[in-house]
Amino acid sequence: MQVTVIGAGLAGCEAAWQLAQRGISVTLHEMKPEKRTPAHHADSFAELCCSNSLRSDQIENAVGLLKEELRRLDSLIMACADATRVEAGGALAVDREGFSNLVTQKIRSHPNITVVPGEVSAIPEGNVIIASGPLTSDALAAAIAEKIGDGHTLNFFDAAAPLVTFESVNMDSAFFASRYDKGTPDYINCPMSEEEYEAFWQALTTAEEAEVHGFEDKHVFEGCMPVEVMARRGHDTLCYGPLKPRGLRDPKTGQEPYAVVQLRRDNAQGSVYNLVGFQTHLRFPEQKRVFSMIPALKNADFVRYGVMHRNTYLRSPGMLDRYYRLIADDRIAFAGQMTGVEGYIESAASGFLAAVEMARRLEGETPVDFPRETAIGALGLYISDTTVSDFQPMNVNFGIMPPLGYRVRGGKRVKNAALAERALGRIDALREAVLSDRKE
């Protein structure tokens, strides 16, 4: 049995690994290093193009639950993330290069996976999982459009945040802490007074943007919105978003500042930090000018400026089923952000499910029923739900799972913990069936 996987991002690598672990021969196509997209900086697989944070690692948060489900089902991406994690409070952040290099090493060393470099411009014959990502090349995008019909692809834009060196941060104007002192004090917090914020906001909202073809409609994904776009929504919008000071007391004053810019470690050495929530598409000189107005960053050395790029995704409901298979041709499945899931872990989960179910189909087995009560199942059911009127990329959340059916005392966190406990119970019940066909 043989399957072609197109794309060695998080979804494609997870899919290739799960297929290979089940004794299936995998040909993995990756256009790097021969060709790169504007968002790529390295030749390794599973490159984290935006943030190095995989978001919350607490099961009371839906993405934390999704991580735990994948861990229990032997996910490659989660194993590599856990092995390369860096301190980030209650979140799971990874050494960006270390994570990508480990995934690459695992994939390249698997005896059932053959990596073929170069661009794919047509959908191959046979069984295929297309995980070419939101920056799918024009040639392959045209082939996909021809296969599924015009009008089934949509676009939005997202952006990446800048990186600065730790040694260039003025720690006399910053302090280490995690919000509400939760976990370890892993974030560098850069406080701003009301006057400093006012000057920063004025500069940010009037700064010159880089030209991005097709961006005139300002169609951005809310979870990756450029900081300058968010700032224009209102004077204090940032203070309720990425610059919110709640739970962060400046040790110099004992008070919460007017606004706080947080920096998160980007590598294991702690030599590089990213500006949390500062996705942007300002021109590079403007990024240097405006972001240097943050007191702790007045002499910051920017090792990478923020960039913005177009993302492509499918109008999946009515086209894909809950297992990410093309309804019109079930030898083809899709995975990753192009299916309409948003986020690193969500992408890996889609690759996991697409591969597990393709392997079972090739073995003549019936699909494993991941119910809506699980995060993995809920995502598949969301992207295939034809009742969704305005389909847009979405992160996993408890809102796409059914309610408990009974009242829980103790607030939202306790309720979410109960939802997570229910989900993990379902996963544990499915684990034997999911892993039974592995040939390791």
Language model features: what each stretch is:
Residues 1-11:
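Beta1/beta-strand and adjacent pyrophosphate-binding region of the FAD-binding site
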Residues 17-79, 372-383:
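N-terminal FAD cofactor-binding segment of flavoenzymes
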Residues 59-63, 67, 75-88, 148-157, ...:
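A short alpha-helix-loop-beta-strand transition element characteristic
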Residues 69-143:
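Feature captures the FAD/FMN-dependent oxidoreductase FAD-binding
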Residues 109-284, 288-289:
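Predominantly flavin-linked oxidoreductase catalytic cores and closely associated redox partners
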Residues 275-341, 348-350, 368-385, 391-395, ...:
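A glycine-rich dinucleotide-binding beta-alpha-beta segment and adjacent secondary-structure elements
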Residues 347-368:
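Internal hydrophobic alpha-helix adjacent to the cofactor/substrate pocket in enzyme cavities
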Residues 391-440:
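C-terminal auxiliary extensions adjacent to catalytic cores
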